[in-house]
Design a protein with these regions (language model features):
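Histone-fold recognition with a strong bias for associated Lys/Arg-rich disordered tails
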Residues: 1-162
Length: 165
C-alpha cells in the first residue's frame, strides 16, 4: 500500500499539532493538539466563527491540555501518537478509501474527529458547532473548495493572535 499523502495545509496542521504537544511536554500527540492546531488554520477558524466564538473553544482546549500530565523537563523524549489519534487517522484513511481521494485533507480529518468516541476534542468541537455536524461540514467543505476566497490557507494575523502558546 502506498504511503498516505497529505495536502500542504494538513501537513502544516500536523506539524503544528506536534509542536503544541512538544511545547506542552506531553508524551502523546492527541486529537486535542490537532484541534488546537486546526484553530490556527484560517478557513477552519472562520467556519467555527460562524457557529460560535473560536476563542471559547481555544480556551477549553488549552484548559484540557494544561491539565494533562506533562513529561518532566529533565527527561528527553519523542512524542508518539495516542491511541485516539491513531484511531482518528485509521478512520480518516477508511473515509479516504471510500471517497477515492488522492490526498488526506483537513475536511477528512475534521469529519473523523467529530465521529471520534470518548474524545474531549470531539466533544468540544461538537459543542462549539452546537452538534450541527452536517451544516458545519457543508460550510467547511465550501470554505476549502472556494480557492478564490482565500489563497493562503494559514495566517498569523486576523484575530488569531490568541492562538499562539
Amino acid at each position: 500500500m502506498a504511503p498516505i499523502q497529505l495536502t500542504d495545509r494538513l501537513e502544516h496542521v500536523r506539524l503544528r499539532a506536534f509542536t503544541i504537544c512538544e511545547q506542552c511536554r506531553h508524551e502523546f500527540v492527541m486529537p486535542e493538539h490537532l484541534l488546537a492546531a486546526l484553530l490556527e488554520e484560517t478557513k477552519f477558524f472562520r467556519t467555527i466563527n460562524s457557529f460560535s466564538n473560536p476563542s471559547t473553544l481555544y480556551n477549553e482546549i488549552f484548559e484540557f491540555l494544561t491539565e494533562t500530565e506533562s513529561v518532566p523537563m529533565e527527561i528527553d523524549y519523542e512524542p508518539t501518537l495516542s491511541t485516539q489519534f491513531q484511531k482518528l487517522l485509521s478512520d480518516t484513511v477508511k473515509q479516504m478509501n471510500f471517497s477515492e481521494v488522492e490526498a488526506m485533507d483537513i475536511i477528512h480529518v475534521v469529519n473523523s474527529l467529530l465521529d471520534l468516541e470518548d474524545s474531549w476534542a470531539s466533544y468540544l468541537l461538537g459543542k462549539s458547532i452546537h452538534n450541527e455536524k452536517a451544516e458545519f461540514m457543508c460550510q467547511l467543505i465550501d470554505a476549502y473548495n472556494d480557492q478564490a476566497a482565500d489563497p493562503q490557507s494559514t495566517t498569523e494575523s486576523e484575530d488569531l493572535s490568541l492562538i499562539h502558546i
